[in-house]
Amino acid sequence: MSHRFRFVALVFAAPAISHAQVGRAGLPQHFEIDAAHSMMGFSVRFMGLSNVRGAFGTYAGTIMYEPSAPERSSVSVVILTKSLSTNSTSRDQHLRSPDFFDVERYPTIAFRSSVVHQADSGYVVDGDFTLHGVTKHLAIPFVMLNPPVSDAWGNQRMTFQGNLRISRKDYGILGTAFWNSEFDPGRMAVSDDVDIELLVSATVPNVDKWMDPAGDSLIKEINRQGVSATMAQLKAGRTSNPNIDSIGPFAYVVAAEKLAKAGRLTDAAGVYATAVELKPHSAMLLAREATLFARQGDRARALGIFEQLRQLDSTSTIAAEWLRVLQRK
């Protein structure tokens, strides 16, 4: 399985780690960027007459938030380049071609923060930005539109807005000579400067609102006969409940996360252990099992599983951020 396929699967299949307040004190809160309510947009001047606006539709991002010490917060983001859209099919195809983004050769754009510091109007996030195979240091100013608050579904949600300008030529995004020609003084076919607009909404979900019949049935079986017996039946392929005979990764996540939120960490760990044994190539399950161990204070096991996740999916922002947190402890 390619890294790109795993990346897309993880974006759409993996809600954020939910038991952010369970376990050891001193660990940051783990937020995942909610792509459905965020925007990674750009704008470039066209012919000196108008702006072409676009955005990327597929991306993942992890924020490790330290509310009492924001400067210790960190973030990693990975964007799928082929997900760009400018509301023109022919233009999008051209932008994806080797003339510009060359998405087959450079399938992702990435940002990894190095330091966060407060500024007059908000925060500045310094870090390494990789685009078109070129990595440069960027300082991105952000304003926090709202600190973590509960939304209508009980999810913890915080929102940031940021803007910056980069040079496309600094990253080797050149196009043909025509697109770099100057028709009149100061009027380029496509400007060198690209304005980037970021609206980031990040969440910690309320697992009580997760609806999954198989996951809820799994909890009922665990309550009825214990986690060991239930997991043994699943591994043997023989259960007493047809609703859990053949369940997917998300059902395991629902069951384990609800058990963890209820303080039943040992039962949650048992669910994840079986799930990973049965579905060893699920990045979502590995991420959640590792996070549970991190919250329980089992640093060595968490590190090992996050390393395994990084080997499975090099684009995993969850693995990147948790490894950073655990390695500095």
Model-predicted segments: where are they?
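Canonical tetratricopeptide repeat
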Residues: 254, 288, 321-322
